[in-house]
């Protein structure tokens, strides 16, 4: 017999982050994403989506460091092909096989960065990773 959760379907699709929190030092990224007030109880959590959340996911030092580390992982695991790096990146982020059109769009994005913005291939891959970490499929659960 398989283990069955007693949680409702809405509760089963939640992601949680468990970290040690010092009440006076709340991580800025978590505060942007409705982190609970550490000075009072929180019986009900409200979900919000506001522009500052998206901006923090694009501009925060932490997320940019994660994108850089992700790009290095892709270069290590698929050193011979940018197409394979993109496919692996999308597969890891979305947890499904990427569609050919998604891979083409990502490659076009990276080529445009190199041609128009004079980004080197590593910078283009890092920016692709930043974009991938901001996909709705990664940030939100359906």
What are these regions (language model features)?
Residues 8-11, 119-124:
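Extracellular/periplasmic catalytic domains that process cell-envelope and extracellular macromolecules
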Residues 80-82, 115-122:
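Short, charged, surface-exposed loops that flank catalytic or proteolytic processing sites
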Residues 128:
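Globin-like tetrapyrrole-binding proteins
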Residues 87, 99-107:
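Short, well-structured alpha-helical segments
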Residues 93, 106-115:
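Amphipathic alpha-helical segments that form the core helices of the histone-fold
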Residues 1-93, 97, 132-142:
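An acidic, gly/pro-interrupted, aromatic-rich
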């Amino acid at each position: 017999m398989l283990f069955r959760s007693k949680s409702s379907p809405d509760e089963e699709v939640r992601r949680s982050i468990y970290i040690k929190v010092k009440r006076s030092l709340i991580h800025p990224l978590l505060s942007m994403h409705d982190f609970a007030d550490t000075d009072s109880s929180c019986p009900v959590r409200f979900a919000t989506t506001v522009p500052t959340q998206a901006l923090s996911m694009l501009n925060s030092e932490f997320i940019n460091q994660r994108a850089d580390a992700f790009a290095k992982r892709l270069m290590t695991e698929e050193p011979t092909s940018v197409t394979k790096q993109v496919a692996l990146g999308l597969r890891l982020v979305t947890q499904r096989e990427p569609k050919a059109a998604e891979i083409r769009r990502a490659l076009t994005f990276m080529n445009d960065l190199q041609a128009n913005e004079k980004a080197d291939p590593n910078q283009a891959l890092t920016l692709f990773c930043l974009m991938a970490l901001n996909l709705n499929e990664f940030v939100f659960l359906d």
